[in-house]
Each structure stands twice: as structure tokens, then as C-alpha cells.
């Protein structure tokens, strides 16, 4: 049986979990991860994966990892920090192979180096199929069902040992154990991946590297993005969370991985199996996360054939028609608010100006989850351009309001800089419901819009006016090929069955969500 090369990671370092993000310290929405995979026997796959991770760095800054296959064995390297901090030329040169997967992660669960390293991906499992490395973006909502399918709390065949230890583990750890367990049982990794797709619920965009193949799989709703590209002249293919990674490695975007699809790439080419078509009774409704377009994705990416920058600019234009106000300038909150601010300015005729300067040398992970530093965080990252805002009526365009504390500090900073009026315009509807699908808002009590009206929020943050883009307005701005979206955080209409387990404090009294299996 092919063996795992322990060149760079100890067994304890390789087989470690990556937990979903808990509450954010800087009052912003965050996802957990970005994933990349490549099959290109004639290329430097580790270096191309490193480039891909750099393009996806906005999706995670706490840790980075790369696993490669030489056709016989897997080798893995990962560590804390940005991709450029984890990998140098010597490290990359030592990762030789025909295929690779990579991962970048964001979390605020703590800064203990041992804990953070345990959460780094890819995870690597050994089994009778030769082993595999797994990188995951999303959150599984039925981990209890997955554990039960492996025999509850009993020992499993996976070397990760999630069930054997009985310790608290992440959904990614459980997914890795599940696949390893059934790969050993069936002697066939692809069968285990199919069983995972049949069983798992929630959001997952996953790349899996085996010694002789690269796999990509996406949940039935297609909540998190995952796309397929080709490397012209290199006889290879790439998988990535976003198309911006293809631009950096010289790949051509072919298409998105479809919801409920399992793709295998090997020496014979691309093979696709549409599990959604074979088992329609298992399928949840398609539901791409709207916040990928509003905030998460890079503006130069394309998701479901929709250009992200174009969508954000359209959100700003639509915002003007829904919530006009007299002002002297329009400014955007860097970075996602800038295209929308430009759209608002163009449609309204109000002058667009830079009004907030972003410190691009501050890592998100610098801010610790303490109240004192949380309040300091906005001043560390943004500074008003006094010349532009002094004595002027300002329209400020931002992507969202979560708890309201960042917006409150932002408005106060602009007033301190001399702004005569501050009118806040948000390119998404009010976030009222928790997310269980890969965003760090899993309890409703942390959302200001769940307990306060627009007028009350406006008063709290100290703005002269506040307006959100309507849900229909937001959807009309995206121009996607398959315009079916997850709107759960706005309207409580969840695309998946009720999570198992469900956080006891997920919902406030009086709120009744709608589940896909209701």
C-alpha cells in the first residue's frame, strides 16, 4: 500500500482538524477557507498551488497548507500565517509531484499556536486506497448523522481518530474520518466520496487528492463556490474557490462545479458524475450564497458566470434608486464597498471620492477577541481622509452591518474628521437570521437587526440616515447564469434540513425559520 511521506509534518500535525469560524472580533462577516487543486504532471504543481493560494488569500489568513502526490505517496506541508510566510522557495521545491491541493484558513478561535496548527489544512488520512489529502470550505450541518454512520462514538478505521478519541472535533475532521472509514470498508475512495455526498448536509466545496487522482465535490445546493479551469499547453486542470486563482496560474476558466457533482481528474482526463441527477430525492434546492457577491469573493472573480465587480457596481446603482439622498460626495468602505460606491455615484451624479484609507499591512489575525482591541480594530485598519470629508455631506457605502459596532465607530471617525452629515447605505438587506453554512454568525443574538429596527440601528450608530438594499434589488444585480440563491440570513428560509445538532441559542424567542424538509 502506498505510504504517506512524513517529510514535513508529524502524524499529529497532518491529521488535525479545522474548525468553522466562531464570533469575529472585528464585527465583520468571515468565511473559513479557500481551496485550490491542480493536476498537471508536466508542471511545478506545488509552486502553482502556492500562487493559487496567494490569489485566494482574502479567504483565509491564519494558516496555509499544500499537499502533493507523486503518483505513489502524499507529502504535506502547512503552517501558521499567510501563504508567503509558510512557504519559501526551498519548501516549495521539496514538494514534487504530479498533482496538489492547497488551503488557506481564517479563524478567530484563539491564537494558541498549537491549537491553530491543529486546525490547518489539508488534512491527510491513511487508508487501504493509498491515503488522501482533503481541503474544505464550508460547514456541515449534520455531523451527528455522519458520526452515527461510522458507528457513533466507536473506534473507526480512520487514523484521524475523531470517533476513537471522543474529543470535540471539527466538521472537516469528521468529514475526513467519514471518507477514510468508508474508503477502507469499500476499498474504493470514489465510492466513499459518493457516500459522503449522499449523507452530508450543509455547505461544502471540497478538493481531495489521492495518489493517482484529484477529486472535487460540491454540496447539493452549491452554497460555496467551486470552479474548474484548464492549463493550456500543460495538459492539466485546476480547481479553485474562485476564478481569480486561475488568472494567477495561467489557467482558463471552463465552468463551475455543479451542485451535487463529483469530478475526478486523472491521467485519462476529466470524469464527472452528477449525483444530483442520479438521486434527485436527495437534492436540496440550488442556493448560491449571496454574500459571495456582496463581500467574500474578490471583485475580479466570476461566480456562476457572473462578474463580481459588475454585480457590486450594480448594487450601488440600485441603492441610489431605492434610497436616494442629497449629498456632496460618495465614498466606499474598502474594499468591497468601493465598486458599489462608484455605481451609486455614477447613477446619482454625486461625486465619488476616496474618503477612507485602508492600512494594507494589518493582518486580520492581529486583532484579538477582546472588547478593548475590538473597539481599536477599526482605527487600526481605516483612517478618514480629512481633506475629502471635512464640511461635506457624505454617503458611505458598505457591504453589511452585523453587530453595529464597526459602523458606529466608522460614523464617529468621519464626524471627528469634520463630516457635516453621514448617510450610510448598505449593499445587502438587514442580516436578521443566523448562518450555519460557513459564515461566523451562528447565533441570532449577535445580530443587531434581529432586535432593532432600521431607525433604532441608525440612532445607535449615529448616522443621519441608514438604508439597506432590498432582497429583490440585490438579486437583480447579479446576472448569474443560474439565479437561485441562499437568502436564509435575510429571510430565515434555509435551503437545507434542520441542522443536527442545532445550537441551543441559535434563534431568539419568536423567530421560526423555514427548513428544506419542513
Label each PLM-derived region with a short phrase.
Residues 157, 185, 322-328, 346-353, ...:
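Secondary-structure transition/capping motifs at alpha-helix termini
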Residues 330, 337-344, 348, 352, ...:
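Extended, hydrophobic alpha-helical segments in both membrane/secreted and soluble proteins
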Residues 168, 173-176, 352-363, 460-478:
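A conserved beta-strand->alpha-helix junction
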Residues 45, 108-110, 142, 215, ...:
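Flexible loop/turn segments at secondary-structure boundaries
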Residues 197, 212-213, 230, 250-256, ...:
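PRPP-dependent phosphoribosyltransferase catalytic core
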Residues 2-259, 264-327, 333, 421:
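Conserved short alpha-helical segments that host acidic/polar catalytic motifs at enzyme active sites
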Residues 349-395, 405, 432-440:
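Short, glycine/charge-rich flexible loops or terminal/linker lids adjacent to PRPP-binding catalytic cores
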Residues 65, 395, 423-425:
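A structural signal for isolated positions on well-ordered beta-strands in alpha/beta enzyme cores
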Amino acid at each position: 500500500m502506498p505510504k504517506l511521506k512524513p517529510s514535513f509534518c508529524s502524524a499529529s500535525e497532518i491529521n488535525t482538524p479545522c474548525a468553522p469560524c466562531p464570533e469575529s472580533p472585528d464585527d465583520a462577516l468571515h468565511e473559513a477557507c479557500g481551496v485550490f487543486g491542480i493536476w498537471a504532471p508536466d508542471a511545478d504543481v506545488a509552486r502553482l498551488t502556492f500562487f493559487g493560494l496567494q490569489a485566494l488569500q482574502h479567504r483565509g489568513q491564519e494558516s496555509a497548507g499544500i499537499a502533493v502526490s507523486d503518483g505513489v505517496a502524499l507529502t504535506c506541508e502547512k503552517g501558521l500565517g499567510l501563504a508567503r510566510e509558510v512557504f519559501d522557495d526551498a519548501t516549495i521545491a521539496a514538494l514534487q509531484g504530479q498533482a496538489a491541493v492547497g488551503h488557506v484558513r481564517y479563524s478567530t478561535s484563539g491564537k494558541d499556536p498549537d491549537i491553530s496548527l491543529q486546525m490547518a489544512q489539508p488534512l491527510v488520512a491513511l487508508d487501504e486506497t493509498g491515503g488522501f489529502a482533503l481541503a474544505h470550505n464550508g460547514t456541515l450541518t449534520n455531523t451527528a448523522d455522519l458520526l452515527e454512520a461510522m458507528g457513533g462514538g466507536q473506534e473507526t478505521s480512520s487514523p484521524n481518530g475523531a470517533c476513537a478519541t471522543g474529543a470535540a472535533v471539527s466538521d472537516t475532521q469528521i468529514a475526513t474520518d467519514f471518507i477514510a472509514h468508508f474508503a477502507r470498508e469499500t476499498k474504493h475512495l470514489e465510492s466513499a466520496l459518493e457516500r459522503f455526498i449522499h449523507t452530508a448536509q450543509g455547505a461544502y466545496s471540497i478538493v481531495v487528492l489521492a495518489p493517482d487522482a484529484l477529486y472535487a465535490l460540491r454540496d447539493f445546493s452549491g452554497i460555496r463556490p467551486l470552479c474548474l479551469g484548464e492549463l493550456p499547453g500543460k495538459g492539466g486542470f485546476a480547481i479553485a474557490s474562485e476564478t481569480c486563482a486561475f488568472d494567477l496560474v495561467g489557467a482558463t476558466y471552463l465552468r463551475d462545479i455543479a451542485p451535487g457533482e463529483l469530478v475526478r481528474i486523472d491521467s485519462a482526463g476529466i470524469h464527472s458524475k452528477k449525483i444530483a441527477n442520479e438521486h434527485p430525492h436527495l437534492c436540496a434546492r440550488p442556493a448560491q450564497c449571496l454574500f459571495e457577491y456582496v463581500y467574500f469573493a474578490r471583485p475580479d472573480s466570476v461566480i456562476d458566470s457572473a462578474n463580481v465587480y459588475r454585480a457590486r457596481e450594480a448594487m450601488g446603482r440600485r441603492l441610489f434608486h431605492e434610497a436616494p439622498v442629497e449629498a456632496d460626495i460618495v465614498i466606499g468602505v474598502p474594499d468591497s464597498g468601493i465598486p458599489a460606491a462608484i455605481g451609486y455615484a455614477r447613477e446619482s451624479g454625486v461625486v465619488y471620492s476616496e474618503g477612507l484609507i485602508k492600512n494594507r499591512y494589518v493582518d486580520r489575525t492581529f486583532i484579538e477577541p477582546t472588547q478593548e482591541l475590538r473597539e481599536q480594530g477599526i482605527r487600526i485598519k481605516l483612517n478618514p481622509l480629512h481633506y475629502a470629508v471635512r464640511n461635506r455631506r457624505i454617503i458611505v457605502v458598505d457591504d453589511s452591518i452585523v453587530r453595529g459596532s464597526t459602523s458606529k465607530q466608522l460614523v464617529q471617525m468621519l464626524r471627528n474628521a469634520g463630516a457635516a452629515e453621514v448617510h450610510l447605505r448598505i449593499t445587502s438587506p438587514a442580516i436578521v437570521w443566523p448562518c450555519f453554512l460557513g459564515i461566523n454568525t451562528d447565533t441570532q443574538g449577535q445580530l443587531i437587526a434581529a432586535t432593532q429596527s432600521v431607525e433604532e440601528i441608525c440612532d445607535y450608530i449615529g448616522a443621519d440616515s441608514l438604508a439597506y438594499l432590498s432582497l429583490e434589488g440585490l438579486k437583480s444585480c447579479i446576472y448569474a447564469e443560474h439565479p437561485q440563491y441562499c437568502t436564509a440570513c435575510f429571510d430565515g428560509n434555509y435551503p437545507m434540513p434542520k441542522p443536527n445538532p442545532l445550537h441551543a441559542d441559535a434563534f431568539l424567542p419568536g423567530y421560526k425559520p423555514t427548513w428544506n424538509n419542513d
